[in-house]
Regions:
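Helix-biased detector of long, well-ordered alpha-helical tracts
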Residues: 1-182
């Protein structure tokens, strides 16, 4: 089975109670495209130094070869690269292919403040924006994977877990909402 982005589905599926780990930052790809293609409009709204710093930060993708190496060494662990559907699209794919639900804590999903500002400027949800360089990992030992990645200078954090039902729940300060297919 192939994803819309042409990436093959993960060979190992997530199972209920597996941790879901975010690696990298959401919507960096979208922010970079915006900085490249809408620079003139952005310069009217944001200071040049802010845009330059945003471009520098959003260009720092995690090393995919290190991520793949860590995942391959850990039994029952799967890697899900984000694509054009962003974080939410990747969460949908992970849960649909694995036939599990999820409980994901929105406030735990890593997204840069600069990216939030740029997405807000264009009225785009950063969790649905293109997110090359962002990955989800489903693992039975999430804390260990998170620790190994962080020790390798790769930003990673547990954002939730796979559930035994089919409910795809996003949990935030405002309560719970269901993830809808984009």
């Amino acid at each position: 089975m192939q994803r819309k982005t042409g990436l093959p589905e993960a060979e190992i599926k997530a199972k209920a109670s597996y941790d879901i780990i975010a690696v990298g930052f959401a919507a960096d790809e979208y922010a970079l495209d915006l900085l490249k293609n809408e620079n003139e409009k952005l310069n009217e709204r944001f200071p040049a130094h802010y845009l330059k710093e945003a471009q520098r930060l959003c260009s720092e993708y995690p090393d995919e070869s290190i991520i793949k190496s860590i995942v391959s060494k850990n039994h029952d662990t799967s890697l899900w690269p984000a694509g054009e559907g962003g974080v939410y699209g990747t969460l949908w794919w992970l849960t649909a292919v694995s036939s599990v639900g999820m409980r994901v804590f929105i406030d735990e999903i890593p997204v840069r403040q600069e990216t939030i500002q740029l997405c807000s400027f264009t009225d785009v949800d950063p969790y649905r924006a293109a997110s090359k360089g962002f990955y989800l990992i489903a693992a039975p030992n999430g804390k260990m994977i998170e620790s190994i990645l962080n020790e390798s200078d790769i930003p990673a954090c547990i954002i939730g877990y796979a559930a035994g039902d089919n409910d795809k729940l996003l949990i935030g300060k405002e309560g719970k909402q269901y993830l809808t297919k984009a």
